């Protein structure tokens, strides 16, 4: 969405796997934001979830496995299960790099420049060559 839909008071949940850390995002408008880290943040094998506190509750559907309740993980400090240490380490490296590069605003600007370049290249009738040093 270019703009968020009017949910008329319903909880907005979003899978942001494809756009995580590509631009600033107002997460206060969402109940749950989650995404796999494998595209923009780190190696496959981990999901980052941001869950509004009022949604972390013991009131779940009957039969929901313990492992699939937000409260289980929140109460355990996100360490209910063995953490994927390598993935956490690599994500940390990306977060530090991202901060050093200027944060999410800088990523949005880079994305805009990339879009302009690829649009120009797509609509050009001339071949485009880039010289590289060997």
Write out the residue ranges for each language-model feature.
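Catalytic PLP-binding core of fold-type I/II PLP enzymes
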Residues: 1-28
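A short alpha/beta connector and helix-capping loop motif
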Residues: 24-39
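Glycine-rich, charged/polar anion/phosphate-binding loops
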Residues: 32-36, 75-78, 125-130
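Active-site C-terminal subdomain of aminotransferase-like
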Residues: 37-112, 116
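Conserved small-domain helix->loop->beta segment predominantly found in fold-type I
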Residues: 106, 117-134
């Amino acid at each position: 969405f270019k703009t968020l839909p009017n949910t008329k008071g319903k909880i907005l949940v979003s899978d942001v796997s494809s756009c995580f850390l590509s631009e600033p995002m107002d997460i206060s408008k969402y109940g749950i934001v989650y995404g796999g880290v494998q595209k923009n943040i780190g190696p496959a094998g981990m999901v980052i979830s941001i869950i509004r506190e009022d949604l972390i509750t013991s009131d779940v559907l009957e039969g929901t496995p313990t492992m699939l309740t937000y409260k289980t993980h929140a109460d355990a400090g996100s360490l209910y299960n063995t953490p994927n240490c390598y993935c956490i380490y690599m994500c940390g490296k990306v977060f530090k790099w991202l901060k050093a590069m200027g944060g999410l605003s800088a990523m949005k600007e880079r994305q805009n420049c990339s879009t302009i370049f690829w649009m120009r290249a797509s609509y050009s009738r001339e071949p485009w060559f880039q010289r590289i040093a060997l």
